[in-house]
Amino acid sequence: MSKVLIEEQSDQGMAKRIINHSGLSVGQLVTKHGSGNIDKLIPKLSRTTASNPWVVFRDSDTRCPVELREQLTKSTTVNPAFLLRIVHPMTEGWLMADPQSFSQYFKITAKKVPVDTELLPHAKHSLLALCKKSRSRDIRGDIVRPDGSTGPLYVSRINEFAENYWDIATAAQNSPSLNRALVRLAELRSFLMNQ
């Protein structure tokens, strides 16, 4: 069982789904409400042991994932029981990288879903803008308020989509950062099984 650290509650479905898809299980899911709170914990978590593995999902917020990872881990040593995955640009981008399932669930024309979600300046804003034009009144009301901010059921709808409808394999074909995360999670699983 892995402990998993995420930024926001709306990342829970994505994290659980990816961990389970990778053949691992979530022992504890911790939400830290913002990347700054996660960044402070990375040096400590990176010293974990195989009996207490940690997986951290942190949004890149449009920064170069490679440079961000180097900055966040420069004072740590490589530890195979610790995995930091940079979600590029953010969770909503990974979810939209499966345009077929995304368009069906959120009742949006598939051709309106961005092809390369890693190029979006702000994936969450893009998702909200798409959902504002949903054919479903329920989706519009749940996901986005009239002023464009997140709606009252944003978190539960995003998590429901991630856990039950999101096709990770399709999304990984469209999102290099998601594909890399799956590769690293497979390596973590292999390491833990050999301990």
Language-model features: locations:
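A short, flexible N-terminal coil/short beta segment enriched in small residues
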Residues: M1-E7
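C-terminal accessory helical subdomains adjacent to catalytic cores in phosphodiester-
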Residues: S2, Q12-Q28, D39-V55, S60-Q195
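Conserved helicase motor
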Residues: K32-S35
